[in-house]
């Protein structure tokens, strides 16, 4: 009994600490390897899109499929789970696209928790709500609506004692931190010299 408790406790703690770091591997795949139901849901939104690419993504917490493309001068990323269920729609934005008060809240968090930082990328995220039709999520995302349920994903690097560390932070629509993970580059052990 004591052993089972220790085993479960150890597994829980390991999972908790691993979830704080992001080890991501993104592999480009053919359209044929992309979930068919996911593609059919997204197909009408891909009209007039350029640079359409399909990916399989494995990170420290999950596996997913992603399609990336450019449409109306915006870089989109639409993510699905392995069953083809829509998870979220993201597109790159600039600081000026975030309401000023909300950006000030985000910036205050960054300044108070990191001595020196540099924002590398900002994405507006439209997550699929549990009671919402995925088609509605896509409609809202492609109309670029600023809604209370959107999030901002900010990728930045910050100075630490050992140099610079990359982070991925997720903030809600008013600038409150939801998650913060250290982000590590892909492992290149497979490259032989």
Where are the regions a protein language model picked out?
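Long, charged/polar, surface-exposed segments that mediate recognition or autoinhibition
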Residues: 82-126
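Short glycine-rich, low-complexity/disordered patches
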Residues: 50-58, 116-132
